[in-house]
Amino acid sequence: MASLVLSSLCFTSQKPCSFTSSLRFSLGALTGSRSAAPLTVGFRPVKRRNGRIRVSVYSRASPLVFRDLDADDFRHPLDKQNTLILKAIPGLNELGRALLGTVTEQIMLLENIGTSVLVSKDQLPELHKMMIEAAGILNIESPDLYVRQSPVPNAYTLAISGKKPFVVIHTSLVELLTRNELQAVLAHELGHLKCDHGVWLTLANLLTLGAYSVPGEEQENLEDDCPYGTRINLFRWLRAAELTCDRAALLVAQDPKVVISVLMKLAGGCPSMADQLNVDAFLEQARSYDKASSSPVGNAQTRQLSHPLPVLRAREIDEWSRSNEYRSLLKRATQMNVVEKV
């Protein structure tokens, strides 16, 4: 049975022809463990004043804003190509939203309200400001933001810009990242919403299933009927969609080392060692991986992953940060003023 795509921050292998466990960057599943020891929600360092937790945040120069930014301005070429193919089918976008949006959003709304903390100007206000700022930079309406208790660093969204779009972040992710890094994560999830990845990737999955199913026959193992080449192409699209959203993260962070640091910490970071991690060494590691993986065995290891490996994502965003495409976007941007930042 095909299910809706949830887009998340971590990396995993999935079956694109079934999506029974749904796409979340994987380290954190929506139904994952919630029994871990409580974690403090906040950025380093955390100070207590009058019995309330105060979050100490780090300021940065006023960021650039992309006022007329369109999703296709930063889409990965493969993501753009496949999305255009589906957009060309009359009525498919509207049908997809009608089928996938309202009921699923309502279910997820109840899940989030019942199990997480809803961020607002009165609840974790610094996180609220970070989301508002990131959404403004990417020219998208700010979704609801929830913080959920989990020992697994992750963030995810229902990647449909419907009536109640949302982003969920785990407490352990907040503990692991700096303010700028966490905002880059929020931007990555906003990228999924801006690109409507939930609509297009789920529709691609459903169309693939429909093309290779036989009416009246048992449908439980449709992924087995899905040709190998088709599965590989879907995986390639999934990986390209993640690279698209890493670009959205860079547009908000406006410093490639911030995005690369997020990927490095998700690959092998912890709060106690965060200050010892080296972004340049991680990029050198990516170059070493390129050499080691340029073989049939290396290709076989990655072609059925739904998310690019973290070292490859780091290399890709480093290269895109030096591209004419990125520089062109920066030239179009304007400075965010103080009023907009509030």
Locate each region found by the language model.
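Active-site scaffold of zinc-dependent metalloenzymes
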Residues: I137, P143-L145, P151-Q183, L190, ...
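Short pre-active-site segment immediately N-terminal to the catalytic Zn-binding motif
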Residues: D122, E126, V168-V185, N233-R239
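Residue-level signature of catalytic and energy-coupling elements of molecular machines
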Residues: M131, I169, H188, C245, ...
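Catalytic Zn2+-binding segment of zinc metalloproteases
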Residues: E189-E218, P256-K257
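Hydrophobic or amphipathic, alpha-helical segments that drive membrane association/targeting
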Residues: A2-K163, P227, R231-L234, L238, ...
